[in-house]
Amino acid sequence: MATVDRWLLPDGIEEVLPPEAARIEAARRQVLDLFQRWGYEFVVTPHIEYLESLLTGAGQDLDLRTFKVTDPLSGRQMGFRADITPQVARIDAHTLRREGPNRLCYAGSVLHAQPRALTTSRSPIQLGAELYGDASPASDIEVISLLVETLELAAVPDVHMDLGHVGIYRGLARAAGLSGEVEQQLFDALQRKAMDEIEALTAALPAGLGNMLRSLAELCGGREVLDLAQAALVEAPDAVHAALDELVAIADALELRYPELPLYFDLGELRGYNYHTGVVFAAFVPGEGGAIAQGGRYDDTGAVFGRARPATGFSTDLKTLVTLGDMRLDEAVRGVWAPDNHDLYLWQAVRRLRSEGERVVQALPGQSEADAREAGCDRLLALRDGRWQVAPLAS
């Protein structure tokens, strides 16, 4: 092996160096503290599991993004987690088994066999919050509000929120009696706003249903879209009206809470259609090709673990938040340099400073004040008037 190969990392895998690693960790702590203030309890899930557990109830997309290995102890197939959300759903449904609403949050590295896009990391730090046990729009409003405040805490500028509801398309598709294959083809065409394909796939449907399905591709824009949708879908089944009413209620609450937050509605955007069951949402910023955070309702996911539960939540990549945002973090390199000296009073001074929250670096044999700057210190402990005192480090 050539020497150069010994330090090369795989595509999409990166190491994080100081001080960036310190910024990411400080951001993680601040966001988890925010989640805790909202009542969300922190959980830690395994990095690797048997595939049967890891992929139960998950879609093909997660299967393709999961690194797979063979367990040398059991011979069974295992996978490195590519998404923490299903693991947390299992904790709620099978492990905790609480009856009422349950709020859980998490932060941890995940590993992707395939990147989501050409320039994205294959080792993001997934951060998220999930609310289980309540099927009302109040839960969706809470998690979207928590996402907004997470992005505000991270000081990510120029955020706009996209909202949709998979129940609208699903209700129309069922009323039209679309086969699974045609429903998927029409879904794909709607994502691409491919009007010729949409026309062809809906041509044989009753005029009313065909017109309503075709209208989804054009129902995108600001708040006025919801008014247009109520007119365009007036003859839709009750399930569609219920979904639209949920979206209106969520939009009303977000506009009241965050009047400066731009909201964009796209009733043909069916992100996570095979996974989500209700409202879907994503946060975007200018200059980023994809969503920087996303989420939605995914009721009954826990059924595969023995207990169906309403669920809604969101996730994001902590590294992305730190890169895009301007979170107030204590980035200044500060510390106290203690000389290489075994004096008991020096040791007591070092312990006192550390107990007060100071960062103290003790010199090793052969080191001097000249090494203090490289160690991130801006002050030193100096013996003056018979006492060890903190003094500025000479420049």
Curated annotation (Swiss-Prot):
Keywords: Amino-acid biosynthesis, Cytoplasm, Histidine biosynthesis
Biological role stated in the UniProt entry: Required for the first step of histidine biosynthesis. May allow the feedback regulation of ATP phosphoribosyltransferase activity by histidine.
GO cellular component, one term: cytoplasm
Domain of life, source organism: Bacteria
Protein name: ATP phosphoribosyltransferase regulatory subunit
UniProt-listed Pfam families: tRNA-synt_His
Family membership noted in the UniProt record: Belongs to the class-II aminoacyl-tRNA synthetase family. HisZ subfamily.
Lineage of origin: Bacteria, Pseudomonadati, Pseudomonadota, Gammaproteobacteria, Pseudomonadales
Transmembrane intervals: none
Pathway field: Amino-acid biosynthesis; L-histidine biosynthesis; L-histidine from 5-phospho-alpha-D-ribose 1-diphosphate: step 1/9
Stored InterPro entries: aa-tRNA-synth_II/BPL/LPL, HisRS-like_core, HisRS/HisZ, HisZ
Subcellular location: Cytoplasm
Subunit structure: Heteromultimer composed of HisG and HisZ subunits.
